[in-house]
Amino acid sequence: MPLGKYYCDYCEKQFQDTPAARKRHLDGAQHHRARALWYDAVRRQELHGGGGGAPPLLHQPGAAAIGVCQHFVRTGTCKFGDSCRYFHPKPPPANPGPAPSGPVSGPMAQQSNIQGSQPNFVGYQAADGSSFSGNILGGHTSWGNLPPSLRPPPEGGYPPFPFVDWG
């Protein structure tokens, strides 16, 4: 009976799938470097909203971004470009968007007034000129990237589904 092949997605290598060969590969320095580059790229995408910064393969193997490029921070440019081994932060947006004009009403604002402190959830900022993670227009909150199952139902309810005979 022929042995199967093992394909490592991190290293893009294929080899015979035996316990000894797999252990030898998983303990190898090249696999550790490739796996670290993969997770650094994932972490970088999460930190910078997807796709910011240089792709991990433009860096030397094992040379993940080590700190912030001070020249880029001061001048806004870097002679090394995407191959710089330091991180190039994105500047904050110049106009973050309209802030709510009046007091914010709702359960989170009431909780804030009752406890005397800000509620602890991501994207919240105080109602004194800053905004929530979604835009507040006419008392309605934009729920952003929430999946449909986590969004509140529409004000008028859901439309009725057409009858389907499963007979």
Curated annotation (Swiss-Prot):
Alphabetical list of SUPFAM superfamilies matching this protein: beta-beta-alpha zinc fingers, CCCH zinc finger
GO molecular function, a single term: DNA binding
Annotated region described as Disordered, given as residue ranges: 89-167
Record has Nucleus as a keyword: no
Source organism of the structure: Oryza sativa subsp. japonica
Cellular compartments per GO CC: U12-type spliceosomal complex
Protein name, as recorded: Zinc finger CCCH domain-containing protein 3
Pro residues composition bias: residue spans: 89-101, 149-167
Cross-referenced Pfam families: zf-CCCH, zf-U1
C3H1-type zinc-finger residues: 63-91
SS bond list: none
Keyword field contains RNA-binding: no
Entry-linked PANTHER family: NUCLEASE-RELATED, ZINC FINGER MATRIN-TYPE PROTEIN 5
Polar residues bias spans: 108-120
Protein keywords: DNA-binding, Metal-binding, Zinc, Zinc-finger
PROSITE patterns registered for this protein in UniProt: ZF_C3H1
Coiled-coil parts of chain: none
